[in-house]
Swiss-Prot record:
Residues 33-184 form the SIS domain. This is Uncharacterized protein MTH_249. CDD domains: SIS_PHI. Belongs to the SIS family. PHI subfamily. It comes from Methanothermobacter thermautotrophicus (strain ATCC 29096 / DSM 1053 / JCM 10044 / NBRC 100330 / Delta H) (Methanobacterium thermoautotrophicum). It comes from the Archaea.
Length: 197
């Protein structure tokens, strides 16, 4: 019989890490992120793997709030323009598809917001705003090894788990900020919820 000790301990570690990581987010950068999203004609979101899934969840909630939002790679996604904003999610800041999207967006004059665990990376070099959520990522392993020796990381939260879960909670918290700014309530979001699924 499973005693759920591993599950409970892991969830507690993830939750504790997320709270501590989000507390370290630079408030000035956060205010700029909010401003850039509010001012954008359209918001584009890019990520790969689990970061993409978290980005899609954020895109859905932005849509529920009335923002014009697109996920990079979807067949209906239009060209990004200078009045738009790209939210680029990558723990390492080196994911090729994400850095290429950031570079391309920057080249046409769009605003780029990086959500990353790595403040100095290829991605942040293309970014106007950097939201750093300090966490272990799937790379580089040299930081992971030293972190394990200091007792900071655990094999039960593999690769990018801490970054991805912390980012998901951060972005859901950001949705609550937008709800407050826009004076929206849950019933307002429900009006835009899908009715054909």
């Amino acid at each position: 019989m499973i005693e759920m000790e591993i599950l409970r301990n892991t969830v507690q570690k993830i939750a504790k890490h997320a709270i501590e990581a989000i507390d370290k987010v630079d408030e000035a950068e956060l205010e700029m992120m909010i401003s850039k999203i509010m001012d954008a004609s359209s918001v584009f979101i890019v990520g790969t793997g689990r970061s993409e899934l978290i980005g899609k969840a954020f895109a859905m909630r932005l849509m529920h709030l009335g923002f014009k939002v697109h996920v990079v790679g979807d067949v209906t996604t239009p060209a990004i323009r200078d009045e738009d904003c790209l939210i680029a999610i990558s723990g390492s800041g080196e994911t090729k598809t994400v850095t290429l999207a950031a570079e391309t967006s920057r080249s046409v004059g769009a605003t780029v917001v990086a959500v990353t665990a790595t403040p100095e990376s290829t991605l942040t070099g293309y970014s106007d705003v950097v939201i750093c959520i300090p966490s272990k990522t799937k790379e580089p392993w040299k930081y992971y090894t030293s972190g394990v020796l200091r007792g900071e990381y655990d094999d039960l939260t593999p690769m990018g788990t801490l970054f991805e879960d912390s980012t998901h909670l951060f972005l859901d918290g950001l949705i609550a900020e937008f709800m407050s700014i826009l004076g929206k309530r849950e019933k307002d979001l429900k009006e835009r919820h899908a009715i054909i699924e």
